[in-house]
Each structure stands twice: as structure tokens, then as C-alpha cells.
């Protein structure tokens, strides 16, 4: 692994083991990141098996090409530089119409957070950016400096769930009338200035939720996850599985809802039986999310909010 792309994988064994790996199966890592999940999954495949890895960050792919070199040399890995919302079209272009399993590790990766110039973190001073795909056009700077007040309030409430969204949006509006808000530190200070003193004494950084909201907006994270997970459920072969790790309530609610819809028969109540073509195509493998062990929590602080949900395809 390259030094500049160090990433501690969360729920490593649980996420992959719950896929019930077939040695000669076809699998997808929808969120390559530091390639931790990919490396462990590939170790369980025979040379007849194959793993397709998605990431829109070229640095993640460059790192993985070094880390997974032995498997690449055996022809067991294909990298796809694209947003995972384009899952189905990319796989179909490669002749793949069915998969045995897929995993998602949603949210921003540690290297993206830690690389100052990517502009994700309120802990390091950098230009406002937050793009997971550095070739994308919309940046955090654009959101903060061009979105109307009402749109800022909407995304802060919807994606940040911050009860001071209106006050923060108003402060941003006032500040950018004087000069553009250009850096993460500037934005963090504006957010802090909008919150009452007693709120600033609470645990956690006062800018955390707003930075999350802007990042989700810049990358359309929830829209992409919604589209991709639905496509993944469709692509799964019978007995194929999907593992999804989430790190905040918005991602977890979305995943839970998609799994619930796919695992529930869409028929009126009171029918004496459910016709086979209306039976659910998916079953939940775990009704409650799997959480990190105490050992993992102590070893990796970033795992504390992680939740893993798993579902299984039961019919086409």
C-alpha cells in the first residue's frame, strides 16, 4: 500500500464473510477505497473467480494496482473508474449480467479525509473542494458561495440534520457578501459563530454535520447509493448476497428501506396466499445491523458509527 493512501478497513471480515464467498464466483467491490475488502475477498477466490472494483478516485485505483498486483497478474481483477451509480451499465459493457455478491463501504475514505488539499476536513485548512471524483465540476466552494439561502437550509437540514441550519445559512450568506468563502477553516469559523455558546461546549466539532451535508450534496452520495443498491439487488444471482456498511443515519435509513422494500411482498393485505411472481426477491440475512467489535472500536476510532446490513437474493 502506498504511504499516501493508508486506510484502515472497517468491519473487514464481517463484510466479506457475510457474502458467503464461492471460490469461482463473480464479485463486486463497489467502493474500492484502500482495497482492504478487495484484498481479503480475493484471498478467498480461486483463479476462476473474478472481482470488479469501482472507484471514481484515480488515486485509489493507483494504490490498489500496487496492493493487488499478484491477483491482477492472475487476471482476477478489473478496475472500473466510475461512480458506482453506473454499476449495471459498466458491468454489462464487460459482459457481466449476473453477480454472486457485492459490497459497499459508503461515505468518504480515510485518505480523502486525511489529504489536506482535498478539502474534506474541518480539521485542516484547505481550499473548499470535497469532490470524491476530482474531475467532477461541482465543488464545496460552489455550494457555499453560489447556493441561495433556501437551498443551503434545505441541504443542511436534510443531509446534516443540524438544528441550527437556518442560522448557519444566514451567516454564510452574510459572509460571502463581503468576500467569497474559500477555505475549510473560514467555513468552520462561520459555522461556529452561528451556534450558541452552550452548543459549542458539546462533544464533537460544531462544523461536523454541515461539512457532511455539503459533502453529500457535492457528490450526490445518497442519490448514487440509492440507484446503485437497487441495481445491485437486480444483478444478484439467486443466493447471491449484498453487504452494505454505513456511517451515518441517512445512509443506514436508505439501506434499511431499500432492503425492506425488496424483501416485502407488494400485495394487498388479507390475500389467502401470495402468487409466486409477487413473492419478494430478497431476504434479510440480519434484521439488526452488525456493529464493530469492542476490539475494533479500540483499534480504529473511525469505526464507532459503522453499521453493516446484509441481504440475500432468493429468486430472480
Curated annotation (Swiss-Prot):
GO terms (BP aspect): rRNA base methylation
Keyword Zinc among UniProt keywords: no
GO CC annotation terms, alphabetical: cytoplasm
UniProt-annotated location(s): Cytoplasm
Reaction(s) catalysed by this chain's protein: cytidine(1402) in 16S rRNA + S-adenosyl-L-methionine = N(4)-methylcytidine(1402) in 16S rRNA + S-adenosyl-L-homocysteine + H(+)
InterPro entries named among the record's database cross-references: RsmH, SAM-dep_MeTrfase_MraW_recog, SAM-dependent_MTases_sf
Keywords assigned by UniProt, alphabetized: Cytoplasm, Methyltransferase, rRNA processing, S-adenosyl-L-methionine, Transferase
EC number of the protein: 2.1.1.199
A GO molecular function held by the record: rRNA (cytosine-N4-)-methyltransferase activity
Binding locations of S-adenosyl-L-methionine: 35-37, 55, 84, 105, 112
Family: Belongs to the methyltransferase superfamily. RsmH family.
Function, as annotated: Specifically methylates the N4 position of cytidine in position 1402 (C1402) of 16S rRNA.
Official protein name in the record: Ribosomal RNA small subunit methyltransferase H
Organism: Streptococcus thermophilus (strain ATCC BAA-250 / LMG 18311)
Lineage: Bacteria, Bacillati, Bacillota, Bacilli, Lactobacillales
